Structure formats: C-alpha cells, structure tokens
Amino acid sequence: MKKIQIDDCICHSKIKEHLDIKDSILSEIDKSSDGNLEQLDSFYTDSISKLDWNISDKLERPWLKIFLPVFLENLQEVIASIGYAKAVIKNVWYQQYLEGDTHGWHIHDDHFTGVYYLEFPEGCSQTEIVSPYNFKVKKIDVVEGDFIIFPAHCIHRGLPNTKKRKTIISYNFSIDGSPIKGRNSLDLEKIKKVNPNIWQPQN
C-alpha cells in the first residue's frame, strides 16, 4: 500500500458580524443549565466545563437562533471558494473551557467540521490538526471572531486551556451535491480554469 499525496486545505475566515453577536450569544449561554464533560481514561482526555453537545441537533436553542443565520451566510462564502454551493448543517454546539480544560484527539462525522472562536482572549489554547498523509501536526493561529472549517476525518484536539475562559462553537456539515434549480451545485468552472485540457476531446 502507498499513500498518494493530494492537496487539501483548512479554510480560515472571520465572522464579519462577530462584534454584533458575541455578547448576546454569551448571555444566552450563561442563562442555560447545560452540563459538563469529564472523560479521562485510556481512550479519551476530555474536560470541558460547559457544553450542549447532547442537543446539538436541536435548532430551537436561544443562542443558536442568533448564531445560525449569521454563520450560514459567512459559511456560504467559504464553501463557494472551494467549489461547493450548498452545505447541510448536521450539528451545532458550544463548548466553554476554564483553566486546565482540554479536548483530546478525536474526529467527527460528516464531510466537514470546524470551530468558531466566539470568546478567545489572548493566550487561550489553540486547535491542533493532524495531516492524514504524514501525521504532522498543524497548530492553527487564530484570534477571536475567526472560524475554521476542515475535513471531519482529520484527527484534531483542543490543547489544555489557560486561566482565561474560552468559548467556541463547533459544527458538523456535509456538502449536498444534488442540482439546485436545475443547475450543477459543483463549481466545475473552477476545475476547467485550472485544468483546461481535461475538457478537450480525447485523441
């Protein structure tokens, strides 16, 4: 068996409305009575002070009503840049980290996952993502208001946090490749532009 390396990417962007939504989302999270996660054994090293993963498929949460319309608009720009037209959100949830909290190595379901750094004071712990080709670890340099998306099969983790509280929003989504209003939902023009010869008749 051999591995054939192809290019893939981590998409790194900003929520343009971050300052408009941050405080209201945090206020709704503070009002909630969600639990914590403690899972420390030979398989997992997870300690998260507050999260709502157990209801991540429910869209009626107050903070999510603020976040989701804004996120979908920003996400659409990102997925268009990599050749797709429609994302189908499967799960959205928040995680709050206090001093020493951590999220060990793990993967997600669906095509893509990612992180929005809602509350991220300077010095907070970062996200690390592993290349499945050579197992090299990439630490993602972000600031508050940024969001990233990456293939959900990539092994990744959240490093142990500092004394400052960190709040992130994570999400899983898949790409819908079915036609939209009779048009191809995959941006084949991007492929044609880079590879014009593969559209020419074969000799």
State each model region's role.
Residues 87-154, 159-160, 165-168, 175-187:
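Catalytic core of non-heme Fe(II) oxygenases with the double-stranded beta-helix
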Residues 189-203:
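Short, cationic low-complexity segments
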Residues 18, 28-32, 63-81, 130-133, ...:
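Hydrophobic, well-ordered secondary-structure segments
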Residues 12-14, 149, 172:
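Short, well-ordered beta-strand micro-motif
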Residues 1-82, 102, 199-201:
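Non-heme Fe(II)/2-oxoglutarate
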